Each structure stands twice: as structure tokens, then as C-alpha cells.
Amino acid sequence: WLASDEDREGEAISWHLCEVLGLDEEKTNRIVFHEITKQAILDAIKNPRHLDMNLVNAQQARRVLDRLVGFKLSPILWRKVKPALSAGRVQSVAVRLIVEREREIQKFQSVPYYRVTAIFALISDSGNATEVKAELDQRFNTHEEVEAFLEKCKDAKFMVESVTKKPLKRSPAPPFTTSTLQQEAARKLGFTVVQTMMIAQKLYESGRITYMRTDSVNLSTLCSNASKDEIIREYGKEYSQTRAYHTSSKGAQEAHEAIRPTYMNEPTIEGTAQEKRLYELIWKRTIASQMADAQLEKTTININIGNTSEKFVATGEVVSFDGFLKVYLESTDDEEHAEDSSHILPALKEGDELQRREILATEKYSLAPARYTEASLVKKLEDLGIGRPSTYAPTISTIQQRQYVVKGDKTGEERTFTIDSLKGIKITQKLKKEMAGSEKGKLLPTDIGIVVNDFLMENFPNIMNYNFTADVEKKFDDIAEGKTEWTNWMKDFDKGFEPEVKEVLEARNQHKAGERNLGNDPKTGKPVFVKIGRFGPVGQIGSAEDKDKPQFAQLP
């Protein structure tokens, strides 16, 4: 009986065991289960199968291709860039993403604009005042526009033009896949990708959760029913809504289940603090996925400015039924709307006249693209169809171990901005300071990472192409489904790859990547280079072809 994990790697392990132990593949039972529970194992034993050689071949193809690319590219890097470097089909593309994002940020020119907000008051017949906060429906690009607008507002009348109420619903996120668990554990718990997988592995091995390397959002009928019972018991029948989710990611294996607790009636477990926190996250996400939508009412109030075409807009949301929000709300990496907030609005009606309390025009700056976190890099790789659940954590770990990428903080720059205020008929301006561009826990390319990326992009553009890497994943899927013969495909790939390798190796007149000729030394007439050496950047006088050995000096 063979009972390794039910994925391509697990199938290959079973095949290797057959080979090593001399077992007959046709007579050896292969069983699979997604959770380590008595019932799951007994069910698996009742339903054995034989080895699936298509899955084995898909894993063999991945292993051979990755070694072929790594074994042929790495020695080139040793000769052309620096010893002890490595390249890989997925890791090099991941580094490319980080390098390109860094260059986007370096090129980015921040553009100022002005966001205008206002505080109004509605005065009741009894003299009580109710405040209303609103934002102008457009932004200004220059300070002159701000001044002109505030001048108009001095004598303007402000009246409620319309009040619109619209019902909204919010639906829960699907159960966890490997990538979404890694992303959410990073956002909510501060775990690294590798840390998340290590803890999840322990939870799986102790029978607490289902298999943690999966790209499926499916839940078994057993889990859906157990979740329904738990929701009705804990929250009431109106909170229950059985849902079936379908995986949208490229090449997903629908036969697998999402990551979920093995027993839905256990919201907490015994274990380490980290195990408890990750388990609770998985339990809440799974339960929420089978709960009713949250029902909200969104109110939008348009406020007319008597002497100009611009309008102020106030928005608010009221939750009429919390539904799944009672248990769980998915986090986001999006910082663009961090300032936006919805609040409960007072009861206003069309025609109500509002008193202006204060109008503020705050200088803002457009934001550069955010650097990748481990979580957002996993999401980007998944969106591009690059890698699989089993490869995300090793890829991110490898590029940091190779020192192509480091995880660190970026200190922002102090920036001055203006706030113009209109109170009564007086316009005043304040200058304030802020730290702009500060980032924590982001993935940053190192000098050697940039050099290696540029060398590979120049000499092996096909290997570094995002579409190529994603297309290879599709080809592995075809092999797993028996649509493609893997050895023939490997031969076809190598026919195109080998000439590229040969051409780069034979380009002897090329300077090493990352090496720059600064001219000649005035004393000796020998060329002066700066380059990346074994232990970092160095200066060099003379070349390896000279009779005398070159002179080196470490650079800071």
C-alpha cells in the first residue's frame, strides 16, 4: 500500500518507492486522502487505485526541465557574472518581477493634487446642529484652482440636491487555497510564507486540517453539511447559506479540496500559539464561506454649491444584517483607499439648506507602485499562472537565500504639504510635514539580483518571459492529463534552448555582466573596471589576459 500525498510530487514519491522496493505497479495499491482522520483513511483503504503515471510524468517533466534550465544557466552565471550563483525557471522570473517593480518606483514622478473636504451643519427648528462630512466630486491640480474655488465658496449657498439610498450586499471569500492562506496569514498574522507552510504542515500531520498544498476552493459535502450545522447552532438559521465554489486559477486541480478544518465543530484547538492562530484563521474563513451575505444600505447625498458646477458628496453605509461579517472579513493589500471611510449619515432630505462650517483643501501626492511583500508576490505569481501551490514558498525562500532579494524596510522622505482652510470668510494656510514612501517588510532587489536579472533578460529572454513560464505550467497540466508525451516535449524544448546557451558561452569578447570599464589608469595605462566580485563590489586595474595579475580593491 502506498499512501503519499495526493499531488504530482506525492505520486512521483510512490512511483520511486515502487522502483526502489521492486514492487509491481499493477499489483500495488495506491490510496489517497486529504485529511488524516480515521474515517478518511478507512474510506481510502476501501477505494484503492493504481499509480497514475500521467501524474508521475508531469512531475518528472517539471523536475527535469527545472534541472535542465538550472544546470545550464548557473555555470554561465559563474563565468559571466560571479561564482556560486544560480538561476531557475521560476525563481528568476520572481526576481524579475521585483527588479521591474523597483525600477518603476525609481522612475515614478509623484504629482501633487488637492483633495477638498467639508463639514456642514443642518440646523433643526429647535436649534440643534447635526454635522455632515462630505468630499468634493473632483480634485484640483494646482493651488490657483484651490484658491479660486474657496473664494467662490465664501458667498455660496449649500443645499441638498438629492438623497439616494441603495441596498448592497457583500459576499464571503471562498475557502483557502495555498496562495490565499499564505497571503491572509501574512496580512492578519504577520507570518512569512515559509512560516505559514511549516505551521500548516504540523496542523495537517496532527489531523487538524486538510492537505495544505492545493489550488482548489472546493469543499466536500460532508464539510458543507457540518458547517451548516455549526452555523445554525452558533448563530441561527438565517446566517446559513450553503455555497459551492469553483476554482478560477489556471491549471487548478478540482479533485482536491480547499484547506479547511477536519472537524467543523472545533473552532479552537490545543497547540502552540502560532498553531492556534493559524487554525482559527482557517476555521473562520471556512465557516464564513458557508454563511449568508451581509446586507447593507448605502446612502449618497449630493450637495449643490449655488455658484459653481462642482458638488460635494457625502456617503455612508449602514449594515442591516451582518451575515458572514459576524465571523470574518478578508484583508487587502490595497492602500489606495486607506483614507476612505463610510459612516452613518444624518437624516437629510432634498432641499435642506446646510451651513458651511469649514472647507479644507489638503495637498496630496500620487503614490508610486508599492513594493512586493511575500504575500503580494505570491498573488502576482498566481495571477500570471507561474508556479504551483507547492512552489510558492520554496521560490520566495530561494531568492532570499541566494541574496538576489532581501526583505527589509524603506525609510521615507520628509515632505511638506499645505492645508488651506475656509472658515467664515477667512482663508488660511498651514504647512505640515509628513514622512512619505515609508514601507516595512517589503522585498527589495540586491545589486547582484539586478545584475543577474539584467544578464538573463539580455541573453535568455525566452526563459525570462512571463508567458513562457505560464505556458510551461499549462504543458505540465497537459502531461498530467495524458495529452502530451513528456520526453518528446523535453527534447523539443532542449533543441531550442541549447543553441542559446552555446551562443552565450562562445561570446568571449563580452565583458562580464555587472562590469563597467571606467577608462585607463594614467600611471600604468591599464584598463580600470568596477564589477561585482565574490564578496561584493570591487575595483580592478588590469585584465586577466595581462602578464601581471590584476590589482583589486574592495569598494564600500
PLM-predicted stretches and their roles:
Residues 160-164, 171-185, 210-214, 368-380, ...:
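Short acidic, hydrophobic short linear motifs in intrinsically disordered regions
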